[in-house]
Amino acid sequence: LWSNSQAVYVHRGAVTDVSIAQEFAAQPLFFLRFLLKSVASSVIGVAQIQELEAGSPWFVRLHLVYLLGLAVFVSYLLALYLNVRFQLYKKTIFPLLLVLSGGCNHLLVLAARWIFLKDEYGMSSRYEIQYQMGIVGILLTFALVWSRCREKAQETEADKAKTRVPEKRAARTLLKVCMLAFTVLTVFGNAWTTRAEIRTAPYRKAYLQVS
């Protein structure tokens, strides 16, 4: 830590030398855009997002990446809530640690790369492995909660409890829809991105060999 504190860092391409607090006070929306874009890139690659934007109406084109980022951000919050609500950490703390690790990685990338003042910097593919820990944690949380909901539904059927069953059933259905939607988005987005990367890999290898 002492050695690191004595180091002199040279950020090539940095466009500001003010502190992060000063920059946040000057343009707070930049940090929000940075986070939303980096969070969105954890389920769908940058090239795929750009492809979706290119074929969308102007309103969707302007806001698609932010809507995706917001959806993933809400899923992070939902996973944290479900870990506490169902006390999943008593059975296994692993999903919660993954969720926290993924979220902290987004904040670390922001803290390290805001100085370039490019809100798409956090979408770089080199950060994807760091982000995927959070996505895996969310999916594991959803899987555990889905299993817990099935167990409770079976208990309700067995006991034939009538009190507040419709409300609980509606809440469980809504929760399942949200979890299923995020799972489909994640699987589809990662499959699409991986397929494109596999197709691009030979050309990237040839380019690196020449250069």
Language model features by range: what are they?
Residues 76-79, 132-152:
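Transmembrane alpha-helices and membrane-interface helical segments
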Residues 116-129, 171-211:
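Membrane-embedded, lumen/periplasm-facing catalytic core of multi-pass transferases
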Residues 82-92, 165-170:
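Membrane-interface helix-boundary motifs at transmembrane edges
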Residues 1, 95, 146-191:
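Signature aromatic-anchored transmembrane alpha helix within multi-pass, membrane-resident enzymes
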Residues 101-126, 139, 148, 152:
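Flexible internal linker/loop segments at domain or repeat junctions
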Residues 2-82, 117, 125, 132:
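Membrane-lumen/periplasm interface segments of multi-pass, membrane-embedded glycan/lipid transferases
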Residues 1, 86-115:
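Transmembrane alpha-helix segments characteristic
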Residues 71, 97-108, 139-142, 181-188:
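Lipid-exposed faces of alpha-helical membrane segments in multi-pass integral membrane proteins
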